[in-house]
Amino acid sequence: QDLPIDKIYTSALRRTHQSVKGFIEKSLPWEQHAGLNEISWGNKEGKSPNTEDDLYYKNLTKTWREGNVHVQSEEGESPVEVLERQKPVVEIILSRPEEKAILIAMHGRAMRVLLTHLFNAPLHHMDNYAHQNLCLYHLQYDYTAQEFRLIKGNCVIHLGDLPESM
């Protein structure tokens, strides 16, 4: 929380707001964008995981890794749909070069989709971007070259000795 941040961008989901509450409480400029929301897992959303759901998830993510990124979760979204709703938010963010240091808070699968887009990687490579809860991806954008550079990925050192249950 000691980083100099010009703006906070979050999804519209309450859990994301809770994750960056300390920054929000500092009265930093903050925008919520539903385009940054986590992928909709459809009829699997919010259910307690069980063996059947775990198998479904593993098979679905395998399908995506094989390049079938248009496949939706049952009654939910595909990675392509997530990316399409993220693109306008990225355009907004990049249109504001005066915001030198920004914090984007979002959930795991949506973050993986976003990172593939920012690094011009194929969407089916989204699982190459590992993540843990509350991890940090530190990126730098070069407006001249119009490209992102990875400074740190999947970093959790800022969490210190937080309990596992957080």
Language-model segments: residues:
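A short, N-terminal amphipathic alpha-helix
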Residues: 1-6, 91-92, 138
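Phosphate-coordination/substrate-recognition cap region in phosphate-metabolizing enzymes
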Residues: 1-61
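Short beta-strand scaffold positions
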Residues: 10-11, 84, 105-106
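Alpha-helical packing segments of well-folded alpha/beta enzyme cores
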Residues: 16, 85-90
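Active-site signature of alpha/beta-hydrolase-fold catalytic machinery across serine-
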Residues: 22, 113-117
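Acidic, low-complexity terminal tails and accessory targeting/binding regions
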Residues: 32, 39-53, 95-100, 116-166
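Short glycine/proline- and acidic residue-enriched helix-loop micro-motifs
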Residues: 59-81
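Generic beta-sheet signal
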Residues: 100-108
